[in-house]
Structure formats: C-alpha cells, structure tokens
Amino acid sequence: NPNLLPEEQTPVIDLAKTLSPTQKKSLEENLNNLEMQSGWKIKYLSQFESVPGIAIKNYWDLDETSLLVIADPRGGNLLNFNVGDAYFSFLPRLFWVELQTRYGNQYYVREHGEDGAVLDAINSVKICLEKGGCQVVPGLPKEQYLWTLSTSILGGLIAGFSAAPR
C-alpha cells in the first residue's frame, strides 16, 4: 500500500510505532549523517498489519549501497534485512545471520524492547562500517569469545583423537 509512505523523504518509516518520537528523530539524524558522510544508505521500516510493499524500493531508491532494516513483530524474529551487494565486501553473509539472531530473537527483544533491538542492530552495522568491516557482530564479550574458542578447539581435539585409527 504506497499510501502508507510519507510525503517528505525520511530514512525512518515507523508504521508499528516501535520507536519513541525522540528515538525516531535521533535515528533519522544519524542515518542522514551517515549517508552524507559515507554514501552508505541505511533505511528503517517497521510494519505491522499494513505494509507499503514494493513501493518502498522506489521511495528510497534502494541500490547496492542500501541496507533496509525491517522490524515486523508478527514473525518469530523481529528483524529482517534487505542487504545491498556492496555491503558484502565489508560484512559477510554470516554477519547478517548473526545480527538477526542476536538482536531479533524473542529473548533479546523481551529484555531490551523492540526499540532497543532495532537501535542496537543498526548501531552494530554503523560501527562495522566505520571500522571498514567486521567478520562478526561487535559486542561479543571477550570471555564468551574465549570460552567458545576453547570449547571448539577441545571438541576438535576429542573428535580428532576418537576418529584416529588404532
């Protein structure tokens, strides 16, 4: 339904009212500044019952430098991403899976709210773009990273020894 799109250009269309007016204004300013300074376009759409559909692509002129962040509470995961091809040079496909599962899952949303999940996910992308790319989503505590690394190595050793011929 293209009638849902605002007359004026804005990088934030919050149909589901996920963000407070202050958060929305701040996000609009941040995303506009990011686009002016770097050329990367991040757009945010929250939807609930009515959706603008394919009209959103023309409204925002989405291209290979565009990231569309969609928040839709109707599914199992709050967040979905429509990622322009240029992003994959800096942020691999697994980054987007991790981003969605970390911030869009029901437990994170329950603890931080829909607004927190959306803003944290967008902030993670911005941090990675400013750093020139990321292989994983930033913010994993060092202890958790080391624990995961050590258990993976230990599991590999156990599997290797048990598979070795005797």
Locate predicted features.
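Folded, non-transmembrane soluble domains that reside on the lumenal/extracytoplasmic side of membranes
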Residues: 1-149
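C-terminal single-pass membrane-anchor helix
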Residues: 138-166
